[in-house]
């Protein structure tokens, strides 16, 4: 019987990101603290259909060809491992592509969870998490969301206390750098000693201390991305000047964020921030997906 389901897929920020080294398989070992935030894509999944279809709104959202999209890759895994029939997906983008905010990972997680629910595939949490990791390192986190410490390539997840209530101003410059460019430049520099951000962030979260959290956020890759896209550092400086408790880049960028105690202060900072192609005020959320 044909049906449809809408799933909201939340973005993530990295309160901390440390690069610990390069593994034999070419991936980088990291330690990170991840937080879901109230910026989202929406997937409308319908099926079963005669063939897979993906429509992205708005056009030109920068998600790439269908066969390279994480949504398609997630469906192919479901088809191969669980016999999932084709579905039609309308993907409404609210998370900017190539931002380090996990939009592609969130979309894949939404497809895995949503198609499993819609089609009655009967996959459990462990099954979905295993498939999620085959799509990408951040996809397992996006399935569950909330606040977590991630290790390995980010797939080993340890839940953490939710942060004290606050607002984030998320901003993205007009141009950035790809993940491959950033890690390539990082490797070319020979890397650096990890910044130790995650330990300080974890202590701040466990203490429920927002000021300490703001002071602790950090990302080992910020100097690399800023070297490729100098606007990143300008946006970080603008957020600090606007009164952010702390400002940091998310993932490999080029999106950055600032933490604010009050919503009014966050909106004022967003209004005054110059040099951004994208600015939103959002808040932490306790899950990665919402739908039904």
Curated annotation (Swiss-Prot):
Disulfide bonds: none annotated. InterPro entries: GHMP_kinase_C_dom (IPR013750), GHMP_kinase_C_sf (IPR036554), GHMP_kinase_N_dom (IPR006204), IspE (IPR004424), Ribosomal_Su5_D2-typ_SF (IPR020568), Ribsml_uS5_D2-typ_fold_subgr (IPR014721). One of its GO terms (biological process) is isopentenyl diphosphate biosynthetic process, methylerythritol 4-phosphate pathway. ATP binds at residues 96-106. Signal peptide: none annotated. Pathway: Isoprenoid biosynthesis; isopentenyl diphosphate biosynthesis via DXP pathway; isopentenyl diphosphate from 1-deoxy-D-xylulose 5-phosphate: step 3/6. It catalyses: 4-CDP-2-C-methyl-D-erythritol + ATP = 4-CDP-2-C-methyl-D-erythritol 2-phosphate + ADP + H(+). It holds the Pfam family GHMP_kinases_C. SUPFAM superfamilies: GHMP Kinase, C-terminal domain, Ribosomal protein S5 domain 2-like. The active site is at 12, 138. Gene3D superfamilies: 3.30.230.10, GHMP kinase, C-terminal domain. Keywords: ATP-binding, Isoprene biosynthesis, Kinase, Nucleotide-binding, Transferase. The keyword Glycoprotein does not apply. The keyword Lipoprotein does not apply. Its EC number is 2.7.1.148. One of its GO terms (molecular function) is 4-(cytidine 5'-diphospho)-2-C-methyl-D-erythritol kinase activity. Catalyzes the phosphorylation of the position 2 hydroxy group of 4-diphosphocytidyl-2C-methyl-D-erythritol. NCBIfam families: ispE. Belongs to the GHMP kinase family. IspE subfamily. This is 4-diphosphocytidyl-2-C-methyl-D-erythritol kinase. It comes from Rubrobacter xylanophilus (strain DSM 9941 / JCM 11954 / NBRC 16129 / PRD-1).
């Amino acid at each position: 019987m044909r049906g449809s389901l809408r799933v909201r897929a939340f973005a993530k920020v990295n309160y901390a990101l440390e690069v610990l080294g390069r593994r034999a398989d070419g991936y980088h070992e990291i330690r990170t603290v991840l937080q879901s935030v109230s910026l989202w894509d929406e997937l409308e999944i319908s099926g079963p259909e005669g063939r897979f279809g993906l429509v992205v709104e708005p056009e030109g959202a920068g998600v790439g060809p269908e066969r390279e999209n994480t949504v398609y890759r997630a469906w192919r895994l479901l088809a191969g491992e669980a016999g999932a029939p084709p579905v039609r997906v309308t993907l409404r983008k609210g998370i900017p592509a190539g931002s380090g905010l996990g939009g592609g990972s969130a979309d894949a997680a939404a497809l895995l969870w949503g198609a499993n629910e819609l089609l009655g595939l009967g996959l459990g949490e462990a099954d979905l998490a295993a498939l999620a990791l085959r799509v990408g390192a951040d996809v397992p986190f996006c399935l569950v969301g909330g606040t977590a410490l991630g290790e390995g390539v980010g797939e080993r997840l340890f839940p953490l206390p939710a942060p004290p209530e606050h607002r984030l101003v998320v901003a993205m410059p007009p141009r950035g750098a790809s993940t491959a460019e950033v890690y390539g430049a990082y490797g070319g520099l020979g890397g650096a000693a990890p910044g130790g951000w995650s330990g300080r962030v974890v202590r701040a979260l466990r203490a429920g201390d927002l000021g300490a959290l703001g002071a602790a956020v950090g990302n080992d890759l910020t100097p690399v991305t800023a070297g490729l896209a100098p606007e990143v550092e300008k946006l970080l400086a603008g957020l600090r000047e606007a009164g952010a408790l702390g400002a940091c880049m998310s993932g490999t960028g080029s999106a950055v964020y600032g933490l604010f105690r009050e919503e009014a202060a966050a909106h004022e900072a967003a209004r005054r921030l110059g040099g951004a192609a994208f600015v939103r005020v959002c808040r932490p959320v306790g899950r990665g997906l919402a739908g039904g």
